[in-house]
């Protein structure tokens, strides 16, 4: 002890720092951006490169739907809303052999798709499940996969809903969802370099989007600043609040050992046990 304080051996400190450094390096972290009160700190950030966002791409789909609603886009004279049903638009592009699914698909609304409450039982359409399926046949694959539960009653996380929203959007408005997102979000954020390959002729919606680290950070700023970027309102504040408010509890997604255990879902966002709003993707993507 010295002056009432315990003196730590500098060699022990150096050893601990070395162990921590090696541990962090083994995690293969590409970048961490932290923003608070308008200030951004960057860690592990070495160079700009396109990085796959995995399921964080779903955020862009939810944002795009909100923009489309706020713009007043309409179908056959009826404005697009959360209660708009998708079946009238997608029925003619799919060969639904599983007839027990039809009545449930007829009930699907935009809101059901945004909250993963379409009636599926479990996760499906992840890359490992569809790698051998013709991407032009994915609409048929999704709509013929058994839907055992009532629509709007049960959360089951999967990649179907963002994809179906993308298909619906393109068929309803004759525009690929990626192009709409580019015009209404990316260009306004000065996102110039990105990659989002189609599933067949449709934007995947759920995954497959590549952005630079700093551009991914801009998407987070839209959430943090209620739709604003550089003092410009890119997405309405009301829609961002809607996206980030809990729509239903998600007991099937809760895992207590996680840093952010999921207790509820918004529109392709999650709410943690401690009230944090976030979106995650496989292999450690968080926003």
Describe every region a protein language model picked out.
Residues 38, 52-82, 165-169, 219:
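Active-site SXXK
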Residues 164-168, 205-228, 285-287:
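Active-site-proximal alpha-helical segments within enzyme catalytic domains
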């Amino acid at each position: 002890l010295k002056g009432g304080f315990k003196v730590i051996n500098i060699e022990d400190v150096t050893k601990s720092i070395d162990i921590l450094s090696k541990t962090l390096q083994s995690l293969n972290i590409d970048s961490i951006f932290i923003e608070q009160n308008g200030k951004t700190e960057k860690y592990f950030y070495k160079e700009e490169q396109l990085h796959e966002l995995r399921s964080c791409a779903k955020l862009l789909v939810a944002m795009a739907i909100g923009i489309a609603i706020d713009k007043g886009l309409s179908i056959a004279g009826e404005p697009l809303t959360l209660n708009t049903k998708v079946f009238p638009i997608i029925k003619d592009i799919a060969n639904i052999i599983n007839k027990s699914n039809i009545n449930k698909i007829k009930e699907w609304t935009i809101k059901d798709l945004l909250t993963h409450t379409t009636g599926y039982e479990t996760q499906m359409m992840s890359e490992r499940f569809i790698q051998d399926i013709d991407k032009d046949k994915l609409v048929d694959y999704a709509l013929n996969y058994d839907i055992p539960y009532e629509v709007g009653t049960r959360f089951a996380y999967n990649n179907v809903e963002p994809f179906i929203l993308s298909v619906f959007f393109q068929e309803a408005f004759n525009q690929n969802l990626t192009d709409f997102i580019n015009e209404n979000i990316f260009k306004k954020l000065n996102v110039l370099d990105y990659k989002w390959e189609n599933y067949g002729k449709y934007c995947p919606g759920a995954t497959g989007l590549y952005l630079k680290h700093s551009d991914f950070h801009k998407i987070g700023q839209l959430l943090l600043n209620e739709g604003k970027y550089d003092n410009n309102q890119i997405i309405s504040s009301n829609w961002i609040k809607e996206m980030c408010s809990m729509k239903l509890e998600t007991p099937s997604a809760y895992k207590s050992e996680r840093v952010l255990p999921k207790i509820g879902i918004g529109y392709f966002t999650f709410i943690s046990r401690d009230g944090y709003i976030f979106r995650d993707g496989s292999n450690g993507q968080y926003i």
